[in-house]
């Protein structure tokens, strides 16, 4: 009886068959996506509420801001954006078209 080599599946890391995101300005959000966004939003609102509360009452720190001791050089040009403003602008652009 001869033994044949075991076949192996090799992945190259590329996904050619994955669906592409919509190219038009109207995005499609699944209920799971909306639930995840809502969870993150509510959790962050809780953190901000706790931080405001602790700052006004002077109580022991429950929320602590993380600041890197050695900044990442690749983030030197990073500029945070206001997501609410970005969404508002995208909504206005969609209404114009």
UniProtKB/Swiss-Prot annotation:
The keyword Phosphoprotein applies. It comes from Mus musculus. The phosphorylation status of MCRIP1 functions as a molecular switch to regulate epithelial-mesenchymal transition. Unphosphorylated MCRIP1 binds to and inhibits the transcriptional corepressor CTBP(s). When phosphorylated by MAPK/ERK, MCRIP1 releases CTBP(s) resulting in transcriptional silencing of the E-cadherin gene and induction of epithelial-mesenchymal transition. The modification Phosphothreonine is found at residue 30. It is found in: Nucleus; Cytoplasm, Stress granule. Belongs to the MCRIP family. Residues 1-29 are annotated as: Disordered. Phosphorylation by MAPK3/1 (ERK1/2) regulates MCRIP1 binding to CTBP(s). A motif (PXDLS motif) lies at residues 80-84. GO terms for biological process: gene expression; negative regulation of gene expression, epigenetic; regulation of epithelial to mesenchymal transition. GO terms for cellular component: cytoplasm; cytoplasmic stress granule; nucleus. Widely expressed (at protein level). The modification Phosphoserine is found at residue 21. This is Mapk-regulated corepressor-interacting protein 1. Keywords: Acetylation, Cytoplasm, Nucleus, Phosphoprotein. It comes from the Eukaryota. The modification N6-acetyllysine is found at residue 79. The modification Phosphotyrosine is found at residue 41. The lineage of its organism: Eukaryota, Metazoa, Chordata, Craniata, Vertebrata. Interacts (unphosphorylated form, via the PXDLS motif) with CTBP1, competitively inhibiting CTBP-ZEB1 interaction. Interacts with CTBP2. Interacts with MCRIP2. Interacts with DDX6. Residues 15-26 have a biased composition (Low complexity).
């Amino acid at each position: 009886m001869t033994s044949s080599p075991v076949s192996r599946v090799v992945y190259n890391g590329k996904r050619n068959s994955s669906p592409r995101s919509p190219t038009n300005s109207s995005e499609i959000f699944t209920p799971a996506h909306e639930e995840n966004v809502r969870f993150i939003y509510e959790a962050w609102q809780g953190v901000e509420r706790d931080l405001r509360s602790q700052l006004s009452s002077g109580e022991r720190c429950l929320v602590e801001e993380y600041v890197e001791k050695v900044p990442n050089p690749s983030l030197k040009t990073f500029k945070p954006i206001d997501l609410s403003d970005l969404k508002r602008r995208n909504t206005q652009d969609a209404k114009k078209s």
